[in-house]
């Protein structure tokens, strides 16, 4: 049994490692195409938007993507399918809640972020238009945590490839036809595509069910939030530093400098 377990670990380590290499290669191609089509200023604008999105998402997510794995995995390991299904519904419900919270944060802080980053309010509308990304990302991380918890590693690996490929295929046309004006729609559409890719592989395992008005789900999810808060605090510090560096470079330099820093 130990030999079989060891072989299983080695097999999937190699498999996931190969998938990771492929994903990195696709990301490199995407970044190179972005640099050619957008110039360093466009890359800098995209990087700045992504740092803001990342900070708001990780702050509003409450660590659900991290803490939810533990409870689902415990029920799955103990062979309690009913409890697994219930917990999956709780995770998905909380993912939607946190996604809506992230959208609200993005809308509320868009004026302040625009002023801090660019010294004026010219980017309020683009930042507001990015608010749906918060919802898409919340659902995405919820689905990947569910698949990890029930050990569907092949699906997790396939999702990584599909997500990278979807981002490449969906962003390049916007960059090619609209240049810097295509940065915001590219981010929205590519994030939507990644979410759809995740759902296409997770829904066959667990059909979509949420209850946004359930008090029971709200109470049951608090255990995940308590576990996730320390994780969120650490992540928020890291993300705030990354966003702060981008904002500093923008204020004291230019978007081209941010693009060069990110590249």
Residue ranges of model-derived segments:
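Interhelical loop/hinge segments that connect adjacent transmembrane helices in multipass membrane
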Residues: 1-9, 199-242
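Interfacial transmembrane-helix starts/ends
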Residues: 9-10, 47, 82-97, 225
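Residues that define the loop-to-transmembrane-helix transition and helix capping
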Residues: 41-44, 89, 124, 153-154, ...
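Helix-loop junctions and terminal segments of transmembrane helices
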Residues: 62-78, 149, 206-207
């Amino acid at each position: 049994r130990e030999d079989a377990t060891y072989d299983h670990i080695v097999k999937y380590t190699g498999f996931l490692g190969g998938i990771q290499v492929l994903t990195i290669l696709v990301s490199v191609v995407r970044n190179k195409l972005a640099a050619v089509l957008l110039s360093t200023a466009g890359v800098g604008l995209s990087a700045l938007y992504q740092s803001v999105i990342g900070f708001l998402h990780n702050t509003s997510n409450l660590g659900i993507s991290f803490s939810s794995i533990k409870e689902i995995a415990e029920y799955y390991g103990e062979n309690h399918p009913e409890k697994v299904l219930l917990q999956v519904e709780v995770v998905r419900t909380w993912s939607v809640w946190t996604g809506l919270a992230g959208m609200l944060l993005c809308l509320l802080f868009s004026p302040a972020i625009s002023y801090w980053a660019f010294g004026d309010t010219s980017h309020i509308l683009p930042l507001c238009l990015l608010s749906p990304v918060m919802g898409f990302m919340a659902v995405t991380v919820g689905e990947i945590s569910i698949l990890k918890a029930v050990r569907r590693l092949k699906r997790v690996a396939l999702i990584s490839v599909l997500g990278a490929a979807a981002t490449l295929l969906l962003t390049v046309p916007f960059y090619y036809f609209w240049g810097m004006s295509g940065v915001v729609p590219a981010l929205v559409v590519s994030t939507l595509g990644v979410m759809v890719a995740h759902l296409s592989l997770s829904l066959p395992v667990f059909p979509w069910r949420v209850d946004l008005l359930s008090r029971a789900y709200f109470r049951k999810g608090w255990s995940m939030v308590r576990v996730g808060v320390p994780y969120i605090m650490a992540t928020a510090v890291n993300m705030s530093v990354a966003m702060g560096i981008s904002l500093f470079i923008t204020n004291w330099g230019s978007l081209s400098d941010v693009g060069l820093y990110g590249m």
